[in-house]
Amino acid sequence: MYGIEYTTILIFLISIILLNYILKSVTRIMDYIIYRFLLITIALFALTRAQNYGLNLPITGSMDTVYTNSTQEEVFLTSTLCLYYPNEASTQINDGDWKDSLSQMFLTKGWPTGSVYFKEYSSIVDFSVDPQLYCDYNLVLMKYDQSLELDMSELADLILNEWLCNPMDITLYYYQQSGESNKWISMGSSCTVKVCPLNTQTLGIGCQTTNVDSFEMVAENEKLAIVDVVDGINHKINLTTTTCTIRNCKKLGPRENVAVIQVGGSNVLDITADPTTNPQTERMMRVNWKKWWQVFYTIVDYINQIVQVMSKRSRSLNSAAFYYRV
């Protein structure tokens, strides 16, 4: 009789111990699942709130200035549209209320008053140094000038694409370009860039590394120069550092909230450096009118079709057409 009672008590104790072990195991498993879920949630939240490119730094100004980087799509009551145009447009129109008139016309196309901004620039070369593209959608009007074809092409290549750039210390290092998307971009009040290609013994190819006058000039007295050299070859670079900066840049892809409208000219400018690629891009357009009123009327008429080939901005743009990302 006592043996049966002892056995019952023993089974009861073993059951309690086993149940306690099971409960602890379940608790540990639940803790693991909960912690993993929280970790994944936090990681996904971080990825959706910030991009993984690092800090965004402007092409002009101090490299110590940090700008907010974000891929979050802010909720706007309305999209903003910026029109950039040469000052000759307002001079030719000669009407103090012309912007208000155009705003009323944009209203008929679904753009509320106050959502369209008109920004004037003095010249293509000056605009190329500090484009300042502020809006969700940015339309840059460039009047065709045969003498400025290369400047227009370089500016279009600059603002229609997104670039990943790093500073270059040309006094200490040689540099080489790794591929077609790799370019050196120099900007300033006056940029003269000379290069000396080097062989495997770091001796100049057709130039003397100790004689700057023997270097090959690839840009002279320009405000914006996108320099392309032979890939895979080290180069010694000479630059007017007092009036110009140079960066080692890689083209990441299109900046789809920017479009260029060429006013005049027989064909849309080719902005590609590679002669084997198709130069056409949907965001490089042309209108062929002599009067600026007609140009703006055409833009108002086709604004929604133009915007359809663009994408709303995913990050704030300030101080320059693109960011250096380090």
UniProtKB/Swiss-Prot annotation:
Miscellaneous information on this protein = Some rotavirus strains are neuraminidase-sensitive and require sialic acid to attach to the cell surface. Some rotavirus strains are integrin-dependent. Some rotavirus strains depend on ganglioside for their entry into the host cell. Hsp70 also seems to be involved in the entry of some strains. In group A rotaviruses, VP7 defines the G serotype.
Location of the region described as GPR motif in the Swiss-Prot/TrEMBL record: 253-255
Report quaternary structure and partners.
Homotrimer; disulfide-linked. 2 Ca(2+) ions bound at each subunit interface in the trimer hold the trimer together. Interacts with the intermediate capsid protein VP6. Interacts with the outer capsid protein VP5*.
Cite the binding residues for Ca(2+) 1. D95, G206, S214, E216
The free-text function statement in the UniProt record for this protein reads:
Calcium-binding protein that interacts with rotavirus cell receptors once the initial attachment by VP4 has been achieved. Rotavirus attachment and entry into the host cell probably involves multiple sequential contacts between the outer capsid proteins VP4 and VP7, and the cell receptors. Following entry into the host cell, low intracellular or intravesicular Ca(2+) concentration probably causes the calcium-stabilized VP7 trimers to dissociate from the virion. This step is probably necessary for the membrane-disrupting entry step and the release of VP4, which is locked onto the virion by VP7.
Family listed: Belongs to the rotavirus VP7 family.
Question: What is the species listed in this Swiss-Prot or TrEMBL entry?
Answer: Rotavirus A (strain RVA/Human/Japan/K8/1977/G1P3A[9])
Region feature CNP motif, mapped onto this chain: 165-167
Pfam families of this UniProt entry? VP7 (PF00434)
Q: What GO CC annotations are associated with the protein?
A: host cell endoplasmic reticulum lumen; T=13 icosahedral viral capsid; viral outer capsid
The name this protein carries in UniProt is Outer capsid glycoprotein VP7
Which InterPro entries does the record associate with it?
Answer: VP7, VP7_1, VP7_2
Residues annotated as binding Ca(2+) 2 are Q177, D228, V229, D231, D301
Report the HAMAP family cross-referenced here: Rota_VP7 (MF_04130), Rota_VP7_A (MF_04131)
Q: Where in the cell is it found?
A: Virion; Host endoplasmic reticulum lumen
Please verify whether the record's keywords include Transmembrane helix. no
Cystine crosslinks: C82-C135, C165-C249, C191-C244, C196-C207
Point out the glycosylated residues in this chain.
N69, N238
Which region is the signal sequence?
A: 1-50
> GO molecular function terms here?
metal ion binding
Q: Which domain of life is it from?
A: Viruses
Q: Post-translational modification, briefly?
A: N-glycosylated. The N-terminus is blocked possibly by pyroglutamic acid.
Q: Which UniProt keywords apply?
A: Calcium, Capsid protein, Disulfide bond, Glycoprotein, Host endoplasmic reticulum, Host-virus interaction, Metal-binding, Outer capsid protein, Signal, T=13 icosahedral capsid protein, Virion
